[in-house]
Amino acid sequence: MSQDNHQAVLRFDRVTVTFGDVEALSGVSFEAFEGESRVILGAAGSGKTVLLKTALGLVKPDSGEVYAFGENLTAMSERQLFDIRSKIGMLFQEGALFDSLTIQENVAYPLLNQRSIHCPPERVLPRVEEALEFVELGGTLEKFPSELSGGMRRRAAIARAVVTEPPLVLYDSPTAGLDPITAHTIIALLIKERDVKQTTTLLVTQRYQDGNLIANFRYNSKQGCIEPARNGARRTMPTTFMVLRDGRLIFEGGQDELEGSHDPYISKFVKQRV
């Protein structure tokens, strides 16, 4: 425990993951604390998605250890991992909605199929409705994913990721393939989720604009919108940026330090700020 005595929600200790002869992650170590936001930048193939899947226990490290909520995931069986995963929301890069299910059924899926959730049957629909209202999709219960726009499908996937009210949420490139206005809407929802529910947030992205919004905006519950706030002003914990290159964590720190870096690899992300 550190960072002003906040509890570490997620910890990587010298984690290495290999696929064949390729090291997808190489000796990665970091801690994410309660209520902290972490923005993970890196080029395609740098290990960002592998890091999230390792945090979820979907990928086992070849060496090193991963801890979530103080428990060692590396030593767990698949059955034991189910309980941990019920505390982690995950938005996969492709959204991964079930095309044959309605939006209501998609969002309800974690409540009905994660054994550790214990949601009473009479509470499932209200929880689904609440999650969809939260992402401003209240009128889509009976629609199918194919009837929604790309941005709306992404918002429905966010609703499914947070319907169980997890304390840790992992987002894998939530704005990929979206136009700038829709991308801004998605990040605004992530900020809303973070600040209203006080979640720990890990955001993987190639877009520095996304990280800049996460770091410098907060949700105003009275106004019902996000508003500018200096990095760290929204609460005691500032946003931490991480940069991966070829599976290695080459940067971990605050936004000012990131923007002051002279590393050309890092600089190319910072130039995307506007």
Task: Please report, for each region that a protein language model flagged, where it lies by residue.
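Short coil-to-helix segment of the ABC ATPase nucleotide-binding domain corresponding to the Q-loop/switch region
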Residues: 101-109
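Conserved ABC ATPase "signature" region
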Residues: 71-72, 112, 119-140
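Conserved ABC ATPase signature
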Residues: 144-148, 152
